[in-house]
Amino acid sequence: MQLLTIGINHHTAPVALRERVAFPLEQIKPALVTFKNVFLGPQAPNTPEAAILSTCNRTELYCATHDRAARDGAIRWLSEYHRIPVDELAPHVYALPQSEAVRHAFRVASGLDSMVLGETQILGQMKDAVRTATEAGALGTYLNQLFQRTFAVAKEVRGTTEIGTQSVSMAAAAVRLAQRIFEKVADQRVLFIGAGEMIELCATHFAAQGPRELVVANRTAERGQRLAERFGGRAMPLSDLPTRMHEFDIIVSCTASTLPIIGLGAVERAVKARRHRPIFMVDLAVPRDIEPEVGKLKDVFLYTVDDLGAIVREGNASRQAAVAQAEAIIETRVQNFMQWLDTRSVVPVIRHMHTQADALRRAEVEKAQKLLARGDDPAAVLEALSQALTNKLIHGPTSALNRVSGADRDSLIDLMRGFYQHAPRSNDQSGH
């Protein structure tokens, strides 16, 4: 079985491409079914395995398959599914086989491949991806083992290194950028669009600055209300956004919408109503919530996840010692996993050997039972049974020795000696 990871992330592709390759949660299960059946092949009983990890910074396909051409098929499927020409997508895609795929999974879960070094959100997202793949019936022995080892490695890395300490989060970076635009965040009105984990983190950081007003707009009014109350703010219907956008100096958006929810026209009207006082906007969603053309407006300061990445990276350099520790742990665990994978490769052969030997045994026992039933001498029947089993069990190795010659034969002879050197002796004449 071959392990393979195909993907794009914030290292290889801009947000404009990442948002086109992202999978909304409700699409992942049906996508897994087509990915397995159409491009990896129905190789029963060795059914291919697959999982999809899709976040704002990455879209990755984890596969286990016997098809050595799965790499090209996976890239082609990703292209066709999202209707992106292969020539446009392929230069941004990485394909990681075997140990590289294992190492990548360990690094991703440990926060080493994140824009925010050591961040923990990705681990939860990976667990969600595994849960979804399990519900879709897409996981099997190999990916199950890979992900269980992945979660164990992430726990070890976070528990024995300082990889996650003093990290500059995306939420903290958003506050830092706002402080570059406004002298005091405390004097500003802040609007959060969405009520997920990222918005909750941003609200925590902005609330610490004591803004003049804090408002949450969300499709689900009850959830938005609960989040607003936590930070002493208030909620408003998302439908009020076009008519009330001008009230806010800072707007942070992160929803699961597949289409922009803030268009150029709405922002132009808001800027005009504000008499060209600046608006600071942060779009943390992928796909983006705010049309990119908004960033061209003179009085709008629009930042995406990629823009915030530059600030985040400033805080990453100081933790390189922890990175080295984490990489060493991961390398050891990769080797351990590959050893397990190697042992799995012989399981089908061993199973086949057992099946063949058992078939021979049953056939000879059946013959012996018939001979005993007709009254043949039991001792003679047992002798014939043992002789027949011996001859048939060594027929394969004997034939193999007779078929080869030269160096191949010498190697096979050494191998056979190793097989039989510990054979028990029923009549030891050594005198010991």
From Swiss-Prot:
Substrate binds at T55, C56, N57, R58, S114, E119, T120, Q121, Q125. It catalyses: (S)-4-amino-5-oxopentanoate + tRNA(Glu) + NADP(+) = L-glutamyl-tRNA(Glu) + NADPH + H(+). NADP(+) binds at G194, A195, G196, E197, M198, I199. Its EC number is 1.2.1.70. During catalysis, the active site Cys acts as a nucleophile attacking the alpha-carbonyl group of tRNA-bound glutamate with the formation of a thioester intermediate between enzyme and glutamate, and the concomitant release of tRNA(Glu). The thioester intermediate is finally reduced by direct hydride transfer from NADPH, to form the product GSA. Possesses an unusual extended V-shaped dimeric structure with each monomer consisting of three distinct domains arranged along a curved 'spinal' alpha-helix. The N-terminal catalytic domain specifically recognizes the glutamate moiety of the substrate. The second domain is the NADPH-binding domain, and the third C-terminal domain is responsible for dimerization. Belongs to the glutamyl-tRNA reductase family. This is Glutamyl-tRNA reductase. It comes from Burkholderia vietnamiensis (strain G4 / LMG 22486) (Burkholderia cepacia (strain R1808)).
